[in-house]
């Protein structure tokens, strides 16, 4: 409750009744990290990165970039190395573009989303559960 409340105050959002979705990531594939905004069903994204410092992060591979627009991974406002318990929280919106340079390998993160409380969110959570289930068998 304290985390939810702090995020709600920080971003001026009402999150009291927002469902949550939790995602555990251990690896990224070549296609991961493409420039995108999150689904409109996701109101807030919380990322906790659990990786040790390595040379890959120093070369900016796999470091999340909060972008100024959809067209250029190099046009970023902030770059966040996914290391040492770094916590990143951002509200979703039509201009919250983000992504990272291609990185294939271990990239551990816990992602918590505060979701919209409607049909879009329920659909997104069903899709998420199905995706998580299939990844167990396909790696």
Where are the regions that the model predicts?
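Low-complexity, Gly/Ser/Thr/Pro-rich intrinsically disordered linker/tail segments
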Residues: 128-139
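A short, highly charged nucleic-acid-interacting micro-segment common to nuclease
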Residues: 1
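Catalytic core of non-heme Fe(II) oxygenases with the double-stranded beta-helix
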Residues: 4-129
């Amino acid at each position: 409750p304290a985390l939810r409340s702090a995020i709600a105050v920080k971003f001026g959002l009402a999150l009291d009744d927002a469902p949550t979705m939790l995602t555990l990531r251990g690896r990224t594939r070549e296609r991961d990290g493409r420039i995108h905004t999150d689904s409109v069903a996701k109101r807030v994204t919380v990322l906790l990165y659990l990786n040790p410092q390595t040379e890959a992060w120093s070369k900016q591979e796999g470091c999340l970039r909060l972008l100024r627009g959809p067209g250029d991974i190099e046009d970023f406002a902030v770059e966040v190395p996914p290391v040492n318990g770094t916590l990143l929280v951002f509200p979703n919106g039509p201009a919250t573009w983000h992504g990272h340079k291609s990185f294939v390998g271990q990239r551990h993160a816990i992602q918590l989303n505060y979701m919209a409380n409607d049909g879009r969110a329920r659909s997104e959570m069903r899709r998420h559960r199905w995706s998580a289930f299939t990844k167990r068998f396909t790696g």
